[in-house]
């Protein structure tokens, strides 16, 4: 199972729980999970992260961005299907509001059985149009999703994660 991360997962982790300079183990773990194809971030989502932000700077270090980048192109037909799940007649302002989220969802839709979206957006099923949350669009399209803490639990993150690796450096 590959978990596709929304940018807000990294932003919230850095701002609230695991600052890059205080909990480097978390950020090293993300790279490791990217290298083992358990966590990936579509290029459209990586592009949402500003280069001058702490996360943007971290992504530029070593091979961090390359380790996490999902190496495939979006299916534009699926992107259109996702956009229609927000509303069939979004205006230009609404397109700007939803940002790159339809790409994230489309990548998961391309392989529903093997992909789960990770987002910090809480479900709000009554919201409409561009205000819809990733989780609610995923529910409508039958795409798996979870929040950051569910991901951390399923993937068994601890700050001592390296000690769980076997003698060959593989988990």
Residue ranges, per PLM feature:
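Acidic, PIN/NYN-like endoribonuclease modules and their adjacent C-terminal/linker elements
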Residues: 2, 123-171
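Active-site-proximal, substrate-binding regions of enzyme catalytic domains
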Residues: 3, 7-115, 123-124, 128
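Hydrophobic beta-strand scaffold residues
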Residues: 115-117, 144-145
């Amino acid at each position: 199972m590959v978990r596709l991360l929304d940018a807000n997962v990294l932003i919230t982790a850095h701002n609230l729980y695991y600052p890059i300079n205080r909990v480097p183990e978390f950020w090293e773990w993300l790279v490791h999970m990217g290298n083992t194809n358990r966590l990936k971030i579509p290029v459209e989502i990586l592009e949402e992260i500003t280069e001058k932000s702490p996360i943007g700077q971290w992504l530029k270090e070593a091979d961090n961005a390359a380790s996490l980048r999902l190496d495939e192109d979006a299916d534009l037909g699926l992107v259109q299907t996702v956009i229609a799940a927000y509303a069939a007649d979004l205006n230009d302002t609404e397109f700007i509001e939803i940002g790159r989220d339809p790409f994230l969802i489309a990548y998961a839709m391309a392989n529903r059985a093997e992909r789960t979206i990770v987002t910090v957006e809480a479900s709000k099923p009554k919201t409409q149009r561009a205000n819809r949350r990733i989780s609610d669009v995923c529910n409508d399209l039958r795409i798996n999703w979870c929040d950051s803490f569910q991901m951390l639990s399923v993937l068994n993150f601890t700050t001592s994660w390296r000690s769980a690796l076997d003698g060959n450096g593989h988990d």
